[in-house]
From Swiss-Prot:
The lineage of its organism: Bacteria, Pseudomonadati, Pseudomonadota, Gammaproteobacteria, Pseudomonadales. NCBIfam families: 16S rRNA (cytosine(1402)-N(4))-methyltransferase RsmH. The keyword Cell cycle does not apply. This is Ribosomal RNA small subunit methyltransferase H. It is found in: Cytoplasm. Pfam families: Methyltransf_5. S-adenosyl-L-methionine binds at G37, G38, H39, D57, F83, D105, Q112. The gene is rsmH. Keywords: Cytoplasm, Methyltransferase, rRNA processing, S-adenosyl-L-methionine, Transferase. Signal peptide: none annotated. GO terms for molecular function: rRNA (cytosine-N4-)-methyltransferase activity. It comes from Pseudomonas fluorescens (strain SBW25). It catalyses: cytidine(1402) in 16S rRNA + S-adenosyl-L-methionine = N(4)-methylcytidine(1402) in 16S rRNA + S-adenosyl-L-homocysteine + H(+). Specifically methylates the N4 position of cytidine in position 1402 (C1402) of 16S rRNA. One of its GO terms (biological process) is rRNA base methylation. GO terms for cellular component: cytoplasm.
Length: 315
């Protein structure tokens, strides 16, 4: 467990993810989602003096933690960039095709969720922000204030998988005409009233808040770009380890890996002559999807939705 500003963060699938990387003492590794450094610290403990670890994060608080770690350990460097941009960063550092492993631990961290000032949670009232990097992009409040009802409904439905997206979006637009949304609790209350069928054990605002967060941070677009960039960065034999926390993320990861196991042949038109190489797999998948153990679920209930998938680059 790492402590940050009074907020606890327990790294999910810590040992399993680092074991899946098969860390080599002299290898170069990327932690695409540094967070509070749980995975990075364990990777560093397995690296030798010639090993290197490059961490990425958009969150300024995570970067501050990373800079403190970098000051202690010269093998580690942290950069304030999305993992979607890791291709550019790796190229700038002359590391393209030389990376032994990439780890992506997706979603929002406990310190982000639990800090009311970040605006991620409907459980704790705070400014309606939701940005991983509060200095860039459009906040959730700004999006809600200006987006057409159809766009808000699309975000709730596509990214939150909310079946009452249209009804909830209309309630949001009706209310914003009277008073703009500035606080998470305010939005959560309107969504709660507009949701006619509450799921047992789940706050009625859960799915809509997820949709907003994913949209504000372009999480699925970043994931698609990051997966492609990670594959290009890896050396042959390098490992890609991805931990996702909801079905939309996991679907993207699963389809990406399945496509590359089949080579490029699936993407070509029928009856088109192709080279044999088009049928040669680019990766192999290591084992089945892995989930948190009973012991981890008991210690950290937020791990219940975690799914880990592992692939190795073949060419």
């Amino acid at each position: 467990m790492t402590i940050d500003s009074g907020f606890n963060h327990i790294t999910v699938l810590l040992d399993e993810a680092v074991e899946a990387l098969a860390v080599r003492a002299d290898g170069c590794y990327l932690d695409g989602t540094f967070g509070r450094g749980g995975h990075s610290r364990l990777i560093l403990s397995q690296l030798g003096s010639d090993g290197k670890l490059l961490g990425f994060d958009k969150d300024p608080q995570a970067i501050a933690t990373g800079q403190a770690l970098a000051a202690e350990d010269g093998r580690f460097v942290v950069v304030q960039r999305s993992f979607a941009e890791l291709g550019a960063e790796v190229a700038e550092r002359g590391m393209a095709g030389k990376v032994a492993g990439v780890l992506l631990d997706l979603g929002v961290s406990s310190p982000q969720l639990d800090d009311p000032e970040r605006g991620f949670s409907f459980m704790n009232d705070g400014p309606l922000d939701m940005r991983m990097d509060p200095t860039r992009g459009v906040s959730a409040a700004q999006f809600i204030a200006t987006a057409p009802v159809e766009e808000i409904a699309r975000v709730f439905k596509e990214y939150g998988e909310e079946r009452f997206a249209g009804r909830m979006a209309r309630a949001v637009v009706e209310r914003r005409e009277i008073q703009p949304f500035e606080r998470t609790a305010d939005l959560a209350e309107v969504l709660k009233v507009a949701n006619p069928a509450w799921e047992k054990g789940k706050n009625p605002a859960t799915r809509a808040f997820q949709g907003l967060r994913i949209h504000v941070n372009n999480e699925l677009g970043d994931l698609e770009a990051g997966l492609e960039a990670a594959l290009e960065a890896l050396e042959v034999g390098g490992r890609l380890v991805v931990i996702s926390f909801h079905s939309l993320e996991d679907r993207i990861v699963k389809l990406f890996m399945r496509r590359l196991v089949k080579g490029e042949s699936d993407n070509l038109p029928r009856n088109l002559p192709v080279r044999f190489e088009a049928f040669v797999p680019k990766i192999k998948i290591h084992g089945k999807a892995q989930f948190a153990s009973e012991a981890e679920l008991k210690a950290n209930p937020r791990s219940r939705s975690a799914v880990m998938r592992v692939a190795e680059k073949l060419r």
